[in-house]
Amino acid sequence: MYVTFNEALDSSFGNLESPNHDFKVGDPNMVPTPPMDSDSAAISLAFLISLSITFAILMLILVVIAAYVTFCGDDESEYDEENALGTRTSGTLHSLFGKKHSGILLDSSFASPGGFDDEIVLQERELEELPKMSAYEVELYIRAKEFQMMSPPMVKDFGTYLDSDDQQFIKDRGIQSYFLLPSINDNIDEYGNFLPSFIVQDKLDIQFSKFNKSSSTVMNYPLPHNRKDAVYFEVKIFRHIQKSNSIFSIGLTTVPYPYFRVPGMAKYSIAYESTGKLRINNPFTASTLLPKLEEGDTVGFGYRYKTGTIFITHNGKKLMDVTQNIGIDLFIGIGAFNAAYTRTYTRDGLLEDPDNVSFREALSEGKDIEVAKDLQRVHDPHDDSDEMTSDEVELHVNLGQVGFVFIEANVKKYAFGSVYGQIGIPPAYNGTEIKKDTILQKGEELPPRYADTDNFFGSMKVKEGSSSRITAQTSKPLWSVGTYERISSNFDRENNVYHDSLETDDNNTDNNVNNNDENAGCNENSPLLEDDGNKRPENSNTPREVSDGAINKNPRNKSTKKRQRNRGKSSKKKNRSRK
C-alpha cells in the first residue's frame, strides 16, 4: 500500500510528538520511496492524442506533396526528351517513356498527365518541324499517324502477349522459334513484279536491297522471360559502306508497327540510329547522343525485369540506361530508309542540324563540305527519272545462339533461351551414328543378292489384251534415239510424216496396189520402180508397231505383200498370153 509524501511526513511528526513512543534515529542509508501517480489512465490518453495529431500532420504533408507533383508538374515540359544533358539529369529520362498507373505507356508528346494539352503541343511541333522536311518525309509521317489510328499499338503488360501454345512452342524450340517477319511493302515495277525492300535469310539475318525506300520489320515474338536478371540481344553490322545513302535503326517497338517507318519514329518505339541519334517516339529532329555506327560494329539492347530498364551497348561496352519502369511487351525492330529522299539528311538538313558543328565551321571558313553525291539534294521517289537506288545494308541478329560481345551477357546468361529448346538438337546425318550400329554394320558385310535380270526392275512384259496389238519383247533390236523421239509424241504420230516412216493406212495400201496393176508393164521394164512400189524395207515399221522400245511385225503387211506379188505374177501371165 503506497501513501503520498504528505501523509508520510505527518505520520513521522506525529510519532515524534507522541509521549508513548521513544525517539529512534533511522538508518542514514535508507532512501525514502518516491511518490507515484495513481492516475495512469489520464497519462495514456494524453499520449494517444499527441500521437494522433502527429500522424495527422504527416498525412496532411504527404497529401500536399502528392497534389503538388500531380497538378503542378509543368516544369517537365521544358525538358528535351532526346537530350540527356538538358535542364534535368539523365536519370529522369524514364518519365518520358514510363507508364501510367493503368499500365498505359506514355509517348514523348507529354511528360505528366494533366499538365497541358498534348494535342496542342503536338500541333505546334508539327507546324515547326514539317516545313523542314521533304514531301516524302511528310507523306511517311501522315501515313504513320493514320496507321496507328486505324491499328492502335497493343500495349500489354510484360508476358501477357503470348498464349499457351506459343509459350510451349518457344520452350520446345528455343531460339530456333524466333525469326524476323518478311517484307510486306508495296514496291512493284511497271510489270507488277514484287521488288522486296529487304530479304530475311536464316531467320535472323536481314539484308536491305537496292529497292528499299523506307521499310522495317519486327520479330515474331516479344522479349522473353529467361528467368535471369535481364534479357539481351545484339546486332552485328555486317555490311554498310562509308558515305552510304542508307540509314538504318535498331531498337524495340510494339506491334503492330508501321512497316514503312523505321523504329524510333512512331509511337511506342525506341531505336539507335546509325547516325548516332537516339530516337524515342520522335519523328522530328533528334540529338546525337551515341557513337555513329560503321561496318563491323555491334549494337546491343538489354531489358532488366525488376526495374524495367532498357540499356544500350556498343562493341561490348555499356553506354547508358535509356529508360526505366517499362512493363510492357516489346519486340525487336530493325528498319532502314534511303536518305536521298529526305531533307533532314541531305545537304540543307545537315547544315541545319545543331549537332553538325564541323559543317557549320567549314561553311563559315569557306571550306568545301564533304557530302555524298547522292545527298547533295533531295530526290523524288515518285519520279522515275529522279529515282535513286539504295546502298545495301546487311545486319545479323544474335539472340544467344553464339557468344555475345558484351561479356556480362555471357557470364549472367542473358540469352533468349537455349539454342534448340527442350527437344534438343536434330540428329546428325554424317554417318557417325550409323557406324556404331551393329546391325547396320552386319548388313554392310553381307549385302543382299539381287536377281540377274536385263534391267534393274527385272524382265518386264506387257500382256496383250483383246484390243491390243503390242507385245513387249526386250530381246529385239531397239529404235534409234532420234526415231524414237519423233514417234514418242502423239502429235507427231498424228500430224507429222517423216521420210523414214511408212504409211499404214489401208486406203493408201489399196491405192498402191491399184497403181501396180495399171503400171504392170512399166514395172517389168523398170525393176527399180517395181521394188520401190511393191516392196517395203525389212527393217522399217510404222509408229503403231513400236512400243516400249520393242519392234513388232504387223501380219497385215505380210498379207499385203503376198497379194501384191500374186497380182504382179497374174498381170505378167496376161501380158504374155496377149502376145
Swiss-Prot record:
Biased composition (Low complexity): 509-525
Cross-link Glycyl lysine isopeptide (Lys-Gly) (interchain with G-Cter in ubiquitin): residue positions: 367
Region of interest called Disordered, as start-end residue ranges on this chain: 499-579
Aminoacyl-tRNA synthetase listed as a keyword: no
Any one of the GO BP annotations: protein transport
Predominant localisation class: membrane
Stretches of the chain found on the membrane's Cytoplasmic side: 1-44
Membrane topology category: Single-pass type II membrane protein
Residues spanning the membrane: 45-65
Positions glycosylated per UniProt: 212, 356, 430, 507, 557, 575
Entry-linked SUPFAM superfamilies: Concanavalin A-like lectins/glucanases
Matches recorded under InterPro entries: B30.2/SPRY, B30.2/SPRY_sf, ConA-like_dom_sf, SPRY_dom, Ubq-SigPath_Reg
Listed GO CC annotations: endosome membrane; vacuolar membrane
Stretches assigned to the B30.2/SPRY domain: 166-364
Keywords on record: Endosome, Glycoprotein, Isopeptide bond, Membrane, Phosphoprotein, Protein transport, Signal-anchor, Transmembrane, Transmembrane helix, Transport, Ubl conjugation, Vacuole
Modified-residue entries (Phosphoserine), positions: 358
Compositionally biased intervals (Basic residues): 555-579
Family note: Belongs to the SSH4 family.
Function in brief: Components of the endosome-vacuole trafficking pathway that regulates nutrient transport. May be involved in processes which determine whether plasma membrane proteins are degraded or routed to the plasma membrane. Confers leflunomide resistance when overexpressed.
Protein's UniProt name: Protein SSH4
Natural source organism: Saccharomyces cerevisiae (strain YJM789)
